[in-house]
Structure formats: structure tokens, C-alpha cells
Amino acid sequence: MPTIIMDSCNYTRLGLSDYMSSKGVKKKNITSVSDIEQLQQRCEQLKPGVVFINEDCFIHETDSSERIRSIINQHPETLFFIFMAISNIHFEEYLYVRKNLIITSKAIKPSTLDSLLSTYLQKKLNMSPRISSGLDVHPLTLSQTESNMLKMWMSGHDTIQISDKMQIKAKTVSSHKGNIKRKIKTHNKQVIYHVVRLTDNVTSGIYVNVR
């Protein structure tokens, strides 16, 4: 299974390379790239199974996020991991924001990575879903109300302001905020903001259930 790593940190590249080797991926099938141009070329040449990208590699140039988005869309059979460039925050969780895109951080546990990759490999091999690891591969989806509220929340509105604007009780706002935190798997507002911004940058945004 060809694997591509785009990360400027030697330690991370080595760690991911050793990790994938321990899973049976041959060293010759693990490729490091240093920029988006190389990433695009290697994805087209190798049709990788997995791509690891550090957000730091594409947040500093204006059109980079758009190019990453394009690469992800062009390779629906490849599983992309994006590590958030977020300091001093411990986030061990992961979020499927698309069927082939997971947002996480470098604090992710190897056991979690094991489960995510085995679920992906089972899906690729069309093995019985009954023996899947049980991990949820449904992309993160918010209700329309949660989505509207999240936008206000990110714009700096507090619970009372949101309550007034949406004409719902403050208790209901708090309940919706609780649901958003549960779905994004964190109570840390900084992580929530970061996830939303990153998802907006590399996709068309968090899915909204418009039923």
C-alpha cells in the first residue's frame, strides 16, 4: 500500500515511516514529499492508499488549501490524514470530515491509528462489515440549527446573544453547544474553531443535515 508523508518534521516523518513499516508496508512504498507540487505528482503516479499531511505545510500560502482540497477530491480511494497545526493543545481524537479525510493531531494514539487503518483496509478489501473494528466512518454532520449556531459562536456571540438572535431559550443553546462539543469530540473551544476553519479550507465545510 503506497504511503505518502508531507511533513517538514524529521521526527514525524521517521515515526510515521516506522509505524507504517511495522504494519507491513515496505520502506520503498513510503514516500516523503516536501511541497504540494510533489504531493500532486506522487498521488497521480502512485495512487497511494494513505497520505499523511501536516497542516503547517499548506496554511502559509493563499492558494495552498484550495490545491489540497483538489488533490483530496481527485483521489476518493485514498485515505488522507491531516494533522492540525495547533500548539499547546492535547487532542487525541480524530474526525472523519469526509469519507476519505480524517482531521486529527500528532497526539493521536497508535492504537487509534491502528483501528482507523484496519477499518479502511477492510473497506478496501470488501471484507465483511461484521468484522469491522466498529469505528464510525460516517463523516461529521451537524444539524442546520447546530451549523447556524456554530457560525454565531465562532463570530464571538455568547449564549444570550445566540438565544436572542435564534429566538430560542438559553438552555436550548447550551444543549446544542453540548451536542456540537460531543460531535467534535472536545470541550476545547480553540480546537472546535480550528477544526471548523481547517474543514472550511480543505472541503466545502462540515456537512449539514438539511432534512
Swiss-Prot record:
Biological process according to GO: regulation of DNA-templated transcription
Family note: Belongs to the RcsA family.
Record HAMAP family: RcsA (MF_00982)
Classification via NCBIfam families: PRK15411.1
DNA-binding residues: 159-178
Swiss-Prot/TrEMBL keywords: DNA-binding, Sensory transduction, Transcription, Transcription regulation
Stretches assigned to the HTH luxR-type domain: 135-200
Protein name: Transcriptional regulatory protein RcsA
Pfam families: GerE (PF00196)
Superkingdom per UniProt: Bacteria
Gene3D superfamilies: 3.40.50.2300
GO MF annotation terms: DNA binding
InterPro entries per UniProt: RcsA, Sig_transdc_resp-reg_C-effctor, Tscrpt_reg_LuxR_C
UniProt gene name: rcsA
Function text: Component of the Rcs signaling system, which controls transcription of numerous genes. Binds to DNA to regulate expression of genes.
